[in-house]
């Protein structure tokens, strides 16, 4: 992750260019810029989006369990390498009680013919081949474009594999997943752990009569416009796209630009006409993203002239792009017990809490979740 992942970029171009199926599991982290930083956002994976790797994203620990096999199975079948990423620290270091997928069920999903074909590509003196060739201008362009059909096939392969995983787990997965009011007028598009916070905020606002929703992006590359439009409510009027990275000098951050392009080039829109689309940035360097901040995002969408390319979660008193955020609220469901522990370095607070949550999760039928900020 972080600068370490960026060191792999030259190799990633070759891996993808030679159609070698592999999976990089990445706990997405900040790429150090003006200061050293080890915490979580999408800076590193966004720097790899042009390499030719397909990109799959999860928002919580259970999704990592369920969708990681999708990356492996689709890579093997489609001959396209994958980055399977989730938020560094917020997801990668969280303790959560999850349901495991039966290994026999996963083994049954394996495409044996694709596996055999992959192994047959190994270098072997019994059937010698030439690799690592150099190509001149007369042929390079054509052979580079020949990979198009492989990438065009990936979204359907991923969708089919997700459908099979959904049958096994009972949890529904698609390249894009919609959550919220079926007649929503204002929606957020995002990926990663923030979608869990947005879902709770959507429930809160719907209980107050507001027509809102969220689209979770699982398959980021290739960006499949067809699957995005399939889940888009026909009633939508305004969309906010949230990015967890900063691309200085660009007209917008990556996910925002992808969504805008998707609407601009779609053959038909479920909503009939082009909705207003704005973008915002949140959570750089593991900055906590709270329900109050997501309420601010929805409030911004209501304005006659919503702020575009905003930030949320900080006070920007230099370029004044930040949204005002109200008082923090708790959206825990009834029956939930929450606790916040404070400790000093090496005083045992973290270890004691880790042991406690594991004991509770392992010896009771209660759902447990724990996270630690250092």
Give names to the regions the model predicted.
Residues 163-186, 322-336:
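Glycine-/acidic-rich phosphate or pyrophosphate-binding loops and their flanking alpha/beta elements
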Residues 82-177:
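Conformationally flexible catalytic loops at phosphate/diphosphate-handling active centers
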Residues 168, 182, 189-218, 335-374:
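Anionic-ligand anchoring segments at beta-strand to alpha-helix junctions in alpha/beta enzyme folds, i.e.
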Residues 38-88, 112, 261-264, 268-283:
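Conserved thiamine diphosphate
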Residues 3-56, 84-85, 105-107:
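N-terminal alpha/beta PP-like core and its mobile active-site loop of ThDP/TPP-dependent enzymes
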Residues 238-332:
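Peripheral docking tails and interdomain loops at the edges
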């Amino acid at each position: 992750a972080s600068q370490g992942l960026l060191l792999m970029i030259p190799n990633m171009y070759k891996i993808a260019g030679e159609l070698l199926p592999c999976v990089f599991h990445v706990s997405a982290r900040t790429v150090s810029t003006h200061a050293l930083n080890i915490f979580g956002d999408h800076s590193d994976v966004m720097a790899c989006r042009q390499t030719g790797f397909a990109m799959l994203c999860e928002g919580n620990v259970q999704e990592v369990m369920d969708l990681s096999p999708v990356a492996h199975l689709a890579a093997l079948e489609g001959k396209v390498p994958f980055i399977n990423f989730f938020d560094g620290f917020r997801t990668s270091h969280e303790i959560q009680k999850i349901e495991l997928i039966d290994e026999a069920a996963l083994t049954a999903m394996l495409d044996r013919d694709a596996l055999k074909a992959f192994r047959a590509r190994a270098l072997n003196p019994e059937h010698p081949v030439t690799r690592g060739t150099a190509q001149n201008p007369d042929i390079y362009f054509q052979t580079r474009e020949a990979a198009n059909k492989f990438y065009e096939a990936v979204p359907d392969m991923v969708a089919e594999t997700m459908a099979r995983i959904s049958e096994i787990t009972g949890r529904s997965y698609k390249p894009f997943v919609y959550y919220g009011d079926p007649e929503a007028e204002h929606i957020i598009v995002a990926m990663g752990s923030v979608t869990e916070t947005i879902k709770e905020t959507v429930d809160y606002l719907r209980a107050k009569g507001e027509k809102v929703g969220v689209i979770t992006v699982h398959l980021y590359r290739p960006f499949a416009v067809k699957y995005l439009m399939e889940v888009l409510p026909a009633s939508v009027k305004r969309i906010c796209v949230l990015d967890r990275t900063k691309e200085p000098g660009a007209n917008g951050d990556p996910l925002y630009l992808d969504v805008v392009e998707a609407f601009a080039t779609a053959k038909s829109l479920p909503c009939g006409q082009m909705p207003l689309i704005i973008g915002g940035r949140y959570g750089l360097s593991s900055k906590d993203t709270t329900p109050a901040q997501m309420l601010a995002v929805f409030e911004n969408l209501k304005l006659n002239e919503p702020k575009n390319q905003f930030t949320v979660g900080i006070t920007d008193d230099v370029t004044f792009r930040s949204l005002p955020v109200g008082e923090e609220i708790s959206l825990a469901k009834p029956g939930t017990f929450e606790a916040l522990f404070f400790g000093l370095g090496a005083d045992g607070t973290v270890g004691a809490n880790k042991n406690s949550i594991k004991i509770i999760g392992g010896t009771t039928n209660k759902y447990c979740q724990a996270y630690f900020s250092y």
